[in-house]
């Protein structure tokens, strides 16, 4: 896959290493020894594990919701500062109302590694994702303003296989009712400075910051 996409466009060497901002306190993500050292003033994995193991004792049995699942993974301090507010802003729900599986794969590392992904290859297309999209669609017929669900038979006849990327409940004609969805609103702001926040990705994890 890496060779294929590089045959279309050139990639830079961007590596995703997010930072969390909790009321002006800065923490590395994913949760790793840099996070734990900043949170508790410690330096070894043994110290971090001891604190987390002590804090997770408040959870008895199998976690029943996202809050319990998060605490069972990273303890109460990190949950309160870096998980709870950010997650509730994302989902528009209290963490106690969200299922545990949402956060079961929360990465926790006992090394000083700020790399969010473990993938061998990482990068962003130079010139943006539009460049690679244009290359992928070269020679393809593109029709805009179409509604697949309005005439399924017509569009099904155009190809041996159809990949539908719309809402799954509408695809099945809402046979089980409408699903609840959360979406994103992107806002662009151009600032007259060389470097505004010091990192490509910063998560504002307190509940009061509206993003």
Description of each model-found segment:
Residues 2-4, 73-74, 126, 185-186, ...:
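Short secondary-structure boundary micro-motifs
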Residues 2-23, 78-81:
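A short alpha-helix-loop-beta-strand transition element characteristic
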Residues 8-11, 95-98, 125, 132, ...:
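Short, solvent-exposed secondary-structure boundary motifs
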Residues 9, 15, 24, 93, ...:
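Residue-level signal for pocket-adjacent positions within structured domains
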Residues 20-161, 165-172:
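Active-site/ligand-binding neighborhood in enzyme catalytic cores
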Residues 148-211:
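Mid-domain catalytic core of redox enzymes
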């Amino acid at each position: 896959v890496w060779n294929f996409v590089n045959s279309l466009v050139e990639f830079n060497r961007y590596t995703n290493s997010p930072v969390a901002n909790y009321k002006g306190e800065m923490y590395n993500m994913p949760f790793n020894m840099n996070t734990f050292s900043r949170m508790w003033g410690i330096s070894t994995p043994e110290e971090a594990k001891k604190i987390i193991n002590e804090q997770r004792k408040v959870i008895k049995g199998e976690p029943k919701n996202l809050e319990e699942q998060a605490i069972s993974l990273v303890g109460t301090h990190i949950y309160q500062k870096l998980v709870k507010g950010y997650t509730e802003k994302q989902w528009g729900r209290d963490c106690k109302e969200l299922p545990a599986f949402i956060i079961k794969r929360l990465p926790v590392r006992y090394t000083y590694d700020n790399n969010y992904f473990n993938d061998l290859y990482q990068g962003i297309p130079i010139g943006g994702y539009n460049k690679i999209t244009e290359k992928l669609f070269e020679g393809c017929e593109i029709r805009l303003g179409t509604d697949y669900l309005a005439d399924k038979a017509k569009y099904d006849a155009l190809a041996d296989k159809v990949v539908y990327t719309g809402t799954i409940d509408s695809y099945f004609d809402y046979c089980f009712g409408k699903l609840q969805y959360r979406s994103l609103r992107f806002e662009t702001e151009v600032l007259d400075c060389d470097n505004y926040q010091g990192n490509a990705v910063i998560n504002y994890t307190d509940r009061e910051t509206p993003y």
